[in-house]
Regions:
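Hydrophobic positions on the alpha1 helix immediately C-terminal to the Walker A/P-loop
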Residues: 160
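Conserved glycine(s) of the Walker
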Residues: 156
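A noncatalytic interaction/capping subdomain that flanks phosphate/NTP-handling catalytic cores
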Residues: 1-148, 153, 163-172, 180-287
Length: 287
């Protein structure tokens, strides 16, 4: 039986239409479920079905720890994303040019991973021109404000967040891997928990004003410095998901990235994975 579910993430509504067996697997989305929204206001809709391979022209690919995402387009220009795990395809996402509608064709292998990836991609692309970005980051809250930790994979974002949780009373984990940030018209920003997290399952429907952004680097010492202008912008951009060779999306991302770099405190923390690093960071940024 086919069903439709509505979810709200970062104040954006989206719809998922799929077989009930697929919908039953979406437990990480339950905190974001709603049945009271006006579906005409939906940011996007995704239809999930079993399907045959999709023919497309490849544009770009990314392989991270055996999880490969290949991006391209069909002959008529529709965006396509293929997901491979260990070299085996899990599914193909085909979207309309504005990403408002998408269809995920499942192969029957790693279906939940293909679904999660599709919803992340469609969310990031469809919201890019609405002041919203999806970060690769860990985020904690303290005293009503959110603090994001950025860095390359393996830098220790989750470790630094854990050190805050263990050593700074009142700290809560908002998301471990993929928080969303939305910039308001007045330049302020709000960070949100999402249904997408990393090795730590943290699927919380929470939000907080964004109090600061910290770029982490491993070092044999602890030192934190503020970043301004181009330095702040360069620290923020690599952690934001987006299809930057699409000019419409790139322009939307740039506007949001510039607003964040200009209006939100950004810091660079060289650090050890220790308590002193967490305390130094907190004492500097959480004023």
């Amino acid at each position: 039986m086919i069903g439709t579910r509505q979810y709200i993430v970062a104040d954006h509504l989206f719809l998922v239409k799929a077989d009930e067996t697929i919908l039953a697997c979406m437990t990480n989305y339950e905190p974001f479920f709603t049945d009271k929204a006006d579906i005409t206001d939906a940011l996007f809709a995704l239809t999930v079905m079993q399907g045959a391979p999709v023919s497309y022209i490849e544009e770009w690919s990314q392989d991270e720890e055996g999880q490969e995402t290949i991006c391209g387009h069909t002959e008529d220009g529709s965006p396509v994303f293929e997901y491979r795990f260990g070299g085996k395809t899990a599914g193909w996402l085909v979207c309309t040019p504005g990403y408002r509608d998408g269809t995920l064709h499942l192969s029957g292998f790693q279906s939940k991973s293909a679904l999660d990836n599709s919803l992340m991609i469609q969310f990031a692309m469809a919201s890019a021109c609405m002041g919203t970005v999806l970060f690769h980051a860990a985020v904690v809250s303290l005293d009503g404000r959110g603090y994001m930790f950025l860095g390359k994979s393996g830098t220790g974002k989750s470790t630094h967040a854990r050190l805050w949780l263990e050593n700074i009373p009142g700290t809560e984990l908002m998301n471990d891997d993929n928080p969303a940030v939305r910039v308001k018209p007045d330049g302020t920003a709000v960070v949100y928990g999402t249904p997408w997290s990393g090795k730590t399952p943290c699927y919380r429907n929470v939000s907080a004003p964004l109090g600061g952004i910290v770029l982490l680097s491993q070092a044999p010492y602890n030192k934190i410095v503020p970043l301004k202008g181009i330095g702040a912008y360069a620290a923020v951009v690599p952690s934001i998901s987006g299809k930057r060779w699409d000019s419409r999306i790139a322009d939307g991302l740039h506007e949001t990235e510039n607003a964040l770099a200009s209006n939100i405190p950004v810091w660079h923390l060289d650090c050890l994975p220790d308590t002193d690093a967490a305390n130094l960071c907190k004492d500097t940024i959480a004023l």
